[in-house]
Regions:
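Cys/His-coordinated zinc-binding microdomains
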Residues: 49-52, 66
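Short, conserved beta-turn/loop elements at beta-strand boundaries and strand-helix junctions
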Residues: 84-90, 143
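Cys/His-rich microdomains that often coordinate metals
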Residues: 54-55, 69, 88
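Short metal-coordination and nucleic-acid-contact micro-motifs, chiefly zinc-binding Cys/His arrays
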Residues: 41-44, 58, 75-77
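Short, basic/aromatic beta-hairpin or loop at an interaction surface
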Residues: 103-118
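Cys/His-enriched microdomains
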Residues: 46, 60, 131
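Well-ordered alpha/beta subsegment
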Residues: 115-164
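A broadly conserved sequence feature marking short terminus-proximal activation segments
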Residues: 2-44, 153-157
Length: 164
């Protein structure tokens, strides 16, 4: 069989905007994590029985030794800010979810008792005063919690006058 080459054509490009509804299923591990946030204001992690790593958010398999994780542990609601970024422009979909005034800061937080970073918003902080290494703590929603990650409103700086 032979084919006859065709003359190349210029691609047609259509510019546009598409909005769609997305639903994320959190699975067995994620569901327990979210239920504890909603019902008890507790941040739970999964601990590896072989290498003792604690994961938040929890995962079902240890990324270090590939063991199945099934030992739930409560971790602290405070931790250390590992890094951060400031969002100054949001896409339309983000504006609906955040319902916050821009700019907004996001951080990766290593919660006390964990070995992993946890991404969340930072609040009650001047953006010019955010420092890597600063201590932060979770601020939970006081109104109806819904069983999603936004049951933690944000993480705020821990008062410097607090004794350790």
């Amino acid at each position: 069989m032979t084919t006859t080459p065709t003359k190349p054509t210029t691609p047609v490009i259509f510019a546009g905007h598409m909005v769609y509804t997305h639903r994320f299923e959190s699975g067995r591990t994620g569901s327990r994590f979210l239920r504890e946030l909603r019902d008890n204001k507790k941040i739970m992690g999964l601990k590896c029985s072989k290498c003792n790593k604690v994961y938040v958010p929890p995962r079902s398999t240890c990324k270090e030794c590939f063991s199945q994780l099934d030992k739930w542990v409560e971790v602290g609601s405070e931790g250390k800010l590992l890094t951060y970024t400031v969002l100054r422009v949001a896409r339309d979909a983000e504006k609906d979810v955040l319902k916050k005034q821009l700019p907004v800061a996001y951080g990766i937080i290593k919660l006390d008792g964990t070995d992993t970073g946890f991404v969340h918003m930072l609040g009650e902080v001047d953006l010019d005063n955010i420092k890597i290494g600063m201590r932060v703590k979770a601020v939970f929603r006081e109104d109806e919690r819904k069983g999603n990650i936004l049951d933690i409103n944000y993480f705020k700086p821990v008062s410097k006058s607090r004794k350790r």
